[in-house]
C-alpha cells in the first residue's frame, strides 16, 4: 500500500482471462464506516458498516453482476439501436456510457474526501465528440457518504449529456432474499413507472413510455419480490423520488439515500440476486423509437 495525504492507495492484482490487471483503491474511514473507491470508473466498491459488521455495497460477483456502484456518463440507459446522432455525425454508444469503464485520476484526497477526474481524450471522442472534465467526489461525513459530480464543458459548443448513479445494495445476510426486504419512499402512496423493452431487436433496453404502470404502496412501502424485475428495471420519471430506503421486512432501516431534484430514478436487480439497485438519474436516454 502507498500512503498519499493520509489516504491509502491499495494496489490489487486481479487475474482476468489470463492477464494480470492492477486496480487501485482509495480508502476513506471514520469510526462508523470504511469506504473504498476504485480509480476504475471512480466506483465505490465497498461500504463497510463497523457498527454491525455488514458490507452494504454489492461485492461484484459476476454470477449476478460484476459491478458495484458505477457512474453513468455521458448517457444513462441505452440509446435506440445503440446509436447517437450529434451534429449530423453518428456515434456508437454503449449502455450507460463509457465512464464506468474508464480509468480516472485521483486529483485530491484527505481523511474524509476523495476526488477523481476523467478528461476527454481522442479515445472518448470516438464515442462522444465533446471536450469535458468529469469530477466525481466522495465525502465521508459521520454515517453518510455524499456523492458529488461536476461536469465541465471545456469546448466551445453546447455539450449534451446525462449522468446518474447505479449503486447496488447487497442484503445484510447471505441467506436473505428479496422478500426479506421492503422499499420505503417517504411521503408516497403510489408511484408511476415504465418498463424497458426486452423484445424488439432495435429497441432492446430502451424505455417503453406508452406502458405506464402504477406501483401501489402501503404505508409508503413496497415489499420486494423477484417478479417485479421480470422486465428489467423500473423507470420512474417526473422527479417522483427524493428519498428512498431499503428496510428489513420488520421496517428497520438498512440503507437509504436522499436525491432531491433528480428527474428520473431507476430500481433494478437480477433474478435471484441478493441485492437491489436504487438509481437517481439526471436525465436518461430517449424512449423506444
What name fits each language-model region?
Residues 30-31, 40, 109-110, 141, ...:
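Structural motif
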Amino acid at each position: 500500500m502507498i500512503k498519499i495525504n493520509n489516504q491509502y492507495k491499495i494496489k490489487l492484482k486481479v487475474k482476468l482471462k489470463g492477464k494480470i490487471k492492477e486496480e487501485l483503491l482509495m480508502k476513506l474511514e471514520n469510526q462508523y464506516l470504511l469506504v473504498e473507491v476504485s480509480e476504475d470508473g471512480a466506483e465505490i466498491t465497498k461500504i463497510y458498516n463497523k457498527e454491525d459488521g455488514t458490507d452494504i455495497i454489492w461485492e461484484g460477483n459476476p454470477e449476478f453482476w460484476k459491478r458495484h456502484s458505477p457512474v453513468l456518463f455521458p448517457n444513462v440507459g441505452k440509446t435506440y439501436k445503440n446509436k447517437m446522432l450529434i451534429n449530423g455525425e453518428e456515434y456508437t454508444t454503449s449502455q450507460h456510457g463509457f465512464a464506468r469503464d474508464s480509468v480516472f485520476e485521483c486529483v485530491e484526497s484527505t481523511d474524509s474526501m476523495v476526488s477523481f477526474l476523467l478528461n476527454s481524450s481522442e479515445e472518448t471522442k470516438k464515442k462522444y465528440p465533446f471536450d469535458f472534465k468529469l469530477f466525481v467526489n466522495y465525502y465521508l461525513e459521520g454515517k453518510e457518504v455524499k456523492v458529488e459530480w461536476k461536469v465541465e464543458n471545456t469546448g466551445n459548443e453546447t455539450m449534451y449529456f446525462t449522468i446518474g448513479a447505479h449503486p447496488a445494495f447487497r442484503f445484510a445476510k447471505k441467506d436473505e432474499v428479496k422478500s426479506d426486504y421492503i422499499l420505503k419512499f417517504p411521503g408516497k402512496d403510489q408511484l408511476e413507472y415504465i418498463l424497458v423493452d426486452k423484445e424488439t431487436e432495435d429497441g432492446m433496453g430502451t424505455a417503453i413510455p406508452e406502458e405506464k404502470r402504477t406501483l401501489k404502496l402501503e404505508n409508503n412501502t413496497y415489499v420486494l419480490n423477484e417478479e417485479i424485475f421480470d422486465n428489467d428495471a423500473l423507470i420512474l420519471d417526473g422527479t417522483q423520488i427524493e428519498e428512498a430506503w431499503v428496510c428489513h421486512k420488520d421496517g428497520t432501516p438498512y440503507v437509504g439515500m436522499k436525491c432531491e431534484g433528480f428527474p428520473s430514478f431507476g430500481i433494478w436487480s437480477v433474478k435471484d440476486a441478493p441485492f437491489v439497485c436504487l438509481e437517481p438519474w439526471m436525465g436518461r436516454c430517449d424512449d423506444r423509437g
